[in-house]
Amino acid sequence: MVLSEVWTALSGLSGVCLACSLLSAAVVLRWTRSQTARGAVTRARQKQRAGLETMDKAVQRFRLQNPDLDSEALLALPLLQLVQKLQSGELSPEAVLFTYLGKAWEVNKGTNCVTSYLTDCETQLSQAPRQGLLYGVPVSLKECFSYKGHASTLGLSLNEGVTSESDCVVVQVLKLQGAVPFVHTNVPQSMLSYDCSNPLFGQTMNPWKPSKSPGGSSGGEGALIGSGGSPLGLGTDIGGSIRFPSAFCGICGLKPTGNRLSKSGLKSCVYGQTAVQLSVGPMARDVDSLALCMKALLCEDLFRLDSTIPPLPFREEIYRSSRPLRVGYYETDNYTMPTPAMRRAVMETKQSLEAAGHTLVPFLPNNIPYALEVLSAGGLFSDGGCSFLQNFKGDFVDPCLGDLVLVLKLPRWFKKLLSFLLKPLFPRLAAFLNSMCPRSAEKLWELQHEIEMYRQSVIAQWKAMNLDVVLTPMLGPALDLNTPGRATGAISYTVLYNCLDFPAGVVPVTTVTAEDDAQMEHYKGYFGDMWDNILKKGMKKGIGLPVAVQCVALPWQEELCLRFMREVERLMTPEKRPS
């Protein structure tokens, strides 16, 4: 009776009024959310500009007081020499900090890599412990590293203005080791992209060529360090986010085993996903700098502040070892066709290693498509992207994430249908779509078990060949801006080692030649799908851009991985600075 009366009331004029009211409310709500997002963009950019102005004024004051300082000579010092001069007193921490502040301000004009000036770095100079391994060293931080009094926005409007109440654990340890964190650097919106753009701070450009992406998600770090604006930085990696920007910007980067360094206090857009491991790692111009950073972080303070981290100090004797290595290698994973420059980089490195007395044997991890399409994609999106999408309510979606957000918003039944229809023509896309559907707790446990079984199978395969380390291609050269988000399959060389949770680092070994670039006309890819076509187009016009190789070791063998990287660096040593 009540329902019929309600229906009668709604069927008349009042029903029309109610419908109009609901529609109006929806429009107003949408407009309000849009205005909120616009306000966040305005505030974020105002703060960014204000911070950069404060940086510049501080630098100008210092230069007026120290007109005879040779900034170029200081900036040219490798990190180990810089540390020696700081600890001996030959250089003051003030001279080093303000010189790098000036360089960071300068290179930011062409790259847009700095999001926030960590203003207390000036007062911290007097507080830094002299005995620390990183005494007086300026360190840049990917924006997700929580820093007291500053926001870690991840390029999302809901995080704008939400300042951290304390430093994350690794930042605390850096300070205890005498380092001076001085800037936050840009990331792609949500950090789930290997490009580097977001609505709050805009696009970061590659220092070697502004029309190219710096990589992501630690793209601001790659651009800043690659252009000489920071001697050392920290990034994170869940699919290649340290390795892409390091490779694209011509620097070195290490993704350690997931739990070797603390993640406590890091900002994320998705919490609780553990199937595919996130790693914290260093980025720098040379491998010795990475090793010094790892040695500094793997100390008693880290193990005290985060008891979930295994108390494994850095093993210097492994890093300094000179025994010949038995190296597995592959030219291709048969999933993403290597560009001519990628293939040449691996083969030239192989030949140099053999000439230096190391043993190189062919090796390819088993069942790579399964690891990528089922395990990695399924692990990252076991909830169908639900947690991820919560971050975008009322926010703008950056173009670098447009395709991903669109796919994740599709209902489960439609993803399944689309996957079925696409499978005959585009099997890779179909497989990824299928894996991005939400799954039950039972299915998630099954997936996690499959990941562990796959990991053990690759370790067994590795040990059966008695390998020390593995040499692989690394995607390169840098792609055009706004291209990485439309070439998802190209993460195959990196995300495999997140799925396996093996330490992996990249070292630049060559640059793209005119012949490499010309041969890209014949590049087809293995599948001929849209990912292959976009990749081909996005990697053209790369003459002179850096190309890296990837060095991999078994879990918890970061020192051996770095030792291998240092050997590759010693043998190859290309020009590392953008011209």
From Swiss-Prot:
Top EC class of this enzyme: hydrolase
Subcellular localization: Endoplasmic reticulum membrane; Golgi apparatus membrane
InterPro entries: Amidase_CS, Amidase_dom, AS_sf, Endocannabinoid_amidase
Transmembrane stretches, start-end: 9-29
Substrates-to-products reaction catalysed: N-(5Z,8Z,11Z,14Z-eicosatetraenoyl)-ethanolamine + H2O = ethanolamine + (5Z,8Z,11Z,14Z)-eicosatetraenoate; (9Z)-octadecenamide + H2O = (9Z)-octadecenoate + NH4(+); 2-(5Z,8Z,11Z,14Z-eicosatetraenoyl)-glycerol + H2O = glycerol + (5Z,8Z,11Z,14Z)-eicosatetraenoate + H(+); N-(9Z-hexadecenoyl) ethanolamine + H2O = (9Z)-hexadecenoate + ethanolamine
Gene deletion effect: Genetic ablation of FAAH bidirectionally dysregulates a subset of intracellular, but not circulating, N-fatty acyl amino acids.
GO cellular component, one term: presynapse
Intramembrane feature spans: 404-433
Topology of the protein relative to the lipid bilayer: Single-pass membrane protein
Activity regulation description: Inhibited the trifluoromethyl compound PF-3845.
Primary residence: endoplasmic reticulum
Stretches assigned to the Cytoplasmic side: 30-403, 434-579
Active site per the UniProt annotation: 142 (charge relay system), 217 (charge relay system), 241 (acyl-ester intermediate)
Chain sites annotated for binding substrate: 191, 217, 238-241
GO terms under biological process: fatty acid catabolic process; monoacylglycerol catabolic process; positive regulation of vasoconstriction; regulation of trans-synaptic signaling by endocannabinoid, modulating synaptic transmission
EC number(s) stated in the UniProt entry for this protein: 3.5.1.99, 3.1.1.-
Subunit details: Homodimer.
Name by which UniProt lists this protein: Fatty-acid amide hydrolase 1
Organism encoding this protein: Mus musculus
